[in-house]
Amino acid sequence: MLAKVAQRKGRGDVRIDKISDGNAACGFAWTWVSGNEEGLRGTTFIELNENGEIQYVREIPEPIFKPGDLTVELLKAVTADAVPKPKPEYQKQTPTTANEVAKYLFLNVQGSDVAESMRFFDDRIFYRDFNYEEPLIGKAEVKNFIETFSFPGIEFRPERFDDGIDSSCFTWDVCLDGQPETIKGLSFYELDPETRKIKYVRDVPESAIKPPILGKLARDFRPGLGVFKGVPIGSRPGGM
């Protein structure tokens, strides 16, 4: 960790874009900035012990190479022989805190009813999944995204949730049928303060290329930005 700090010392800053309001654990979305440019983005999850000391951290930067729809094709190829499982049963609920919404969607509803999941998204949802270059805007695009990634042999397995009220961060593994290794990731969910529906999502998966050579090269080449080419501050969709 000290080596990572030393590499960027005096060469750039970390902008905190969003931070969840959990007490026992929280997460934050961040962007590296240097001068008038911004670069690498990512998310960090931090969990405290009973003494208020940090006991667990997961931090994942965005992949430099974003495969887009090739991600789906690869996952479907890996799970081609998977046998469909019965849809899980769930008891319908309407949670209104961010961490409970996330838990309900991924511990209860997942794999059962896309329509029930969509009930919790705001009409103007801004959804950033770092497998893709561009964000998803609106419920129609998000619904198509969820349906695209719903096929036999893939399981989105949440691990740790924070206790945020208006926003929540949680860790997860993507488990593929018959594969011993998983794909780790982080998600950040933010609710609209009035409707209590999800208005913002950031999903960050591990790089599909392991070890992530492109990421290391970019950070060595431009340690202040962490990417090969930065963009003007605030020029990205949604400002981040």
Feature locations, PLM:
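C-terminal and inter-domain tail/linker signature
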Residues: M1-M240
